[in-house]
């Protein structure tokens, strides 16, 4: 442990002004993009009534979590880098900032897992999804996620998995020690388990969609009919379906007596269901991109944490650790870009709202009432 601290001090002493400038510039850019981007998406989701439904409630919650982390936690990291990787705000402030950072991380992980489950329900069990996933259900899920996140982030405040200022990371977070005297390993294992479970749910969803798209050979069975209705044993039911859709002529088939013929609405309902299915797939693709980017940007930092817990010999290289920490910071500002570039509906609503705000109002003509 002493060797680790001594090596870290040597790395910090060799920190060049150029490195500090790059850190401050990149972190300032991340703060601005994250706060502005997530705030714009939040305003759009709250203002447009067509987006007041299940998947976008969760997206609004994710945006609020990223705004919380970017607006409160990142400025303290900025000041830490500016002051030469030192903390000048006291132990209690360090614990509060670390609590908020870990809270946001676990909240995003839990919420992405819940979103993956709802995405599977939206495609595999669409009728159940549309009936049960109401506003109050989404609110209950959001409250549950925040409760679980607080339960995960609060114990270190009471020195169970101690929060402290890590100079190599320029932030207050978990103090990762060797696994023999470590009490933060359980938190990291749970986070990795949540990310793995989220990927498995999306993998199951991909298999479900692939199985439904797989074309199977048609097995023709001979059907017998005297009046071209083709009902009874051996019939595929297509003639009856055509008659119900309004394309049948002649008398009613015997098996369809008492059923009213519908000429127009059946085709419309089928097209509406197909459009909804495609829309749900696009939304699922957007949330999977968010999940994949979360895993990609947080992955190197998790590797560095496990390295410090289990490795006995060499410490984590300073360049790798800095890049991993800043990649985890960048995750807070990546979701607005994913929303705009991968969701056609959000892009259309955003352009409509922007054009409406920029539209100049014509002056009123003077008139008189006769």
From Swiss-Prot:
<feature type="transmembrane region" description="Helical; Name=6">
    <location>
        <begin position="287"/>
        <end position="307"/>
    </location>
</feature>
<feature type="topological domain" description="Extracellular">
    <location>
        <begin position="159"/>
        <end position="188"/>
    </location>
</feature>
<comment type="subunit">
    <text>Interacts with DLG4 and DLG3.</text>
</comment>
<dbReference type="InterPro" id="IPR051509">
    <property type="entry name" value="GPCR_Orphan/Phoenixin"/>
</dbReference>
<keyword id="KW-1003">Cell membrane</keyword>
<dbReference type="GO" id="GO:0005886">
    <property type="term" value="C:plasma membrane"/>
</dbReference>
<keyword id="KW-0812">Transmembrane</keyword>
<dbReference type="InterPro" id="IPR000276">
    <property type="entry name" value="GPCR_Rhodpsn"/>
</dbReference>
<feature type="topological domain" description="Cytoplasmic">
    <location>
        <begin position="335"/>
        <end position="370"/>
    </location>
</feature>
<feature type="transmembrane region" description="Helical; Name=7">
    <location>
        <begin position="314"/>
        <end position="334"/>
    </location>
</feature>
<feature type="glycosylation site" description="N-linked (GlcNAc...) asparagine">
    <location>
        <position position="182"/>
    </location>
</feature>
<comment type="function">
    <text>Orphan receptor.</text>
</comment>
<feature type="glycosylation site" description="N-linked (GlcNAc...) asparagine">
    <location>
        <position position="83"/>
    </location>
</feature>
<feature type="topological domain" description="Extracellular">
    <location>
        <begin position="1"/>
        <end position="25"/>
    </location>
</feature>
<dbReference type="GO" id="GO:0004930">
    <property type="term" value="F:G protein-coupled receptor activity"/>
</dbReference>
<keyword id="KW-1133">Transmembrane helix</keyword>
<feature type="topological domain" description="Cytoplasmic">
    <location>
        <begin position="118"/>
        <end position="137"/>
    </location>
</feature>
<dbReference type="Pfam" id="PF00001">
    <property type="entry name" value="7tm_1"/>
</dbReference>
<feature type="disulfide bond">
    <location>
        <begin position="94"/>
        <end position="172"/>
    </location>
</feature>
<keyword id="KW-0675">Receptor</keyword>
<feature type="topological domain" description="Extracellular">
    <location>
        <begin position="308"/>
        <end position="313"/>
    </location>
</feature>
<dbReference type="InterPro" id="IPR017452">
    <property type="entry name" value="GPCR_Rhodpsn_7TM"/>
</dbReference>
<keyword id="KW-0807">Transducer</keyword>
<feature type="transmembrane region" description="Helical; Name=2">
    <location>
        <begin position="58"/>
        <end position="78"/>
    </location>
</feature>
<dbReference type="GO" id="GO:0005783">
    <property type="term" value="C:endoplasmic reticulum"/>
</dbReference>
<keyword id="KW-0297">G-protein coupled receptor</keyword>
<keyword id="KW-1015">Disulfide bond</keyword>
<keyword id="KW-0325">Glycoprotein</keyword>
<feature type="transmembrane region" description="Helical; Name=3">
    <location>
        <begin position="97"/>
        <end position="117"/>
    </location>
</feature>
<feature type="topological domain" description="Cytoplasmic">
    <location>
        <begin position="210"/>
        <end position="286"/>
    </location>
</feature>
<feature type="topological domain" description="Extracellular">
    <location>
        <begin position="79"/>
        <end position="96"/>
    </location>
</feature>
<feature type="transmembrane region" description="Helical; Name=4">
    <location>
        <begin position="138"/>
        <end position="158"/>
    </location>
</feature>
<protein>
    <recommendedName>
        <fullName>Probable G-protein coupled receptor 85</fullName>
    </recommendedName>
</protein>
<keyword id="KW-0472">Membrane</keyword>
<feature type="transmembrane region" description="Helical; Name=5">
    <location>
        <begin position="189"/>
        <end position="209"/>
    </location>
</feature>
<keyword id="KW-0256">Endoplasmic reticulum</keyword>
<comment type="similarity">
    <text>Belongs to the G-protein coupled receptor 1 family.</text>
</comment>
<feature type="transmembrane region" description="Helical; Name=1">
    <location>
        <begin position="26"/>
        <end position="46"/>
    </location>
</feature>
<feature type="glycosylation site" description="N-linked (GlcNAc...) asparagine">
    <location>
        <position position="3"/>
    </location>
</feature>
<feature type="topological domain" description="Cytoplasmic">
    <location>
        <begin position="47"/>
        <end position="57"/>
    </location>
</feature>
């Amino acid at each position: 442990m002493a060797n680790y601290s001594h090596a870290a001090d040597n790395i910090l002493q060799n920190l060049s002004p150029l490195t500090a400038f790059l850190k401050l510039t990149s972190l300032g850019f991340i703060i601005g993009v994250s706060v502005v981007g997530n705030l714009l998406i939040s305003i759009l989701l709250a203002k447009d009534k067509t987006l007041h439904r299940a998947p976008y409630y969760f997206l609004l919650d994710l945006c609020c979590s990223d705004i919380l982390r970017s607006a409160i936690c990142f400025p303290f990291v900025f000041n830490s880098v500016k002051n030469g990787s030192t903390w000048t705000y006291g132990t209690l402030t360090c614990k509060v900032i670390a609590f908020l950072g870990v809270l946001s991380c676990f909240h995003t992980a839990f919420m992405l897992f819940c979103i993956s489950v709802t995405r599977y329900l939206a495609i595999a069990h669409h009728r159940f999804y549309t009936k049960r996933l109401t506003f109050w259900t989404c609110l209950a899920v959001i409250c549950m996620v925040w409760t679980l996140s607080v339960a995960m982030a609060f114990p270190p405040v009471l020195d169970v998995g101690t929060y402290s200022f890590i100079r190599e990371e320029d932030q207050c977070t978990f103090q990762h020690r060797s696994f023999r005297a470590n009490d933060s390993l359980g938190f990291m294992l749970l986070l990795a388990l949540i990310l793995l479970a989220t990927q498995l749910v999306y993998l199951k969803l991909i298999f479900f969609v692939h199985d439904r798209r797989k074309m199977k050979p048609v097995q023709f069975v001979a059907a017998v009919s005297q009046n071209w209705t083709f009902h009874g044993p051996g019939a595929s039911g297509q003639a009856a379906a055509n008659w119900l859709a309004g394309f049948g002529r002649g008398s009613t088939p015997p098996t369809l007596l008492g059923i009213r013929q519908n000429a127009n609405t059946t085709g419309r309902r089928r097209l509406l269901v197909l459009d909804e299915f495609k829309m749900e797939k696009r939304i699922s693709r957007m949330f999977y991109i968010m999940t994949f980017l979360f895993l990609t940007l947080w992955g190197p930092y998790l590797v560095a944490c496990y390295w410090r817990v289990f490795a006995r010999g060499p410490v984590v290289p300073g360049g790798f650790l800095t890049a991993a920490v800043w990649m985890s910071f960048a995750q807070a500002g990546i979701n607005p870009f994913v929303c705009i570039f991968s969701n056609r509906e959000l892009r259309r609503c955003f352009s409509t709202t922007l054009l409406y705000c920029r539209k100049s109002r014509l002056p009123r003509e003077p008139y008189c009432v006769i």
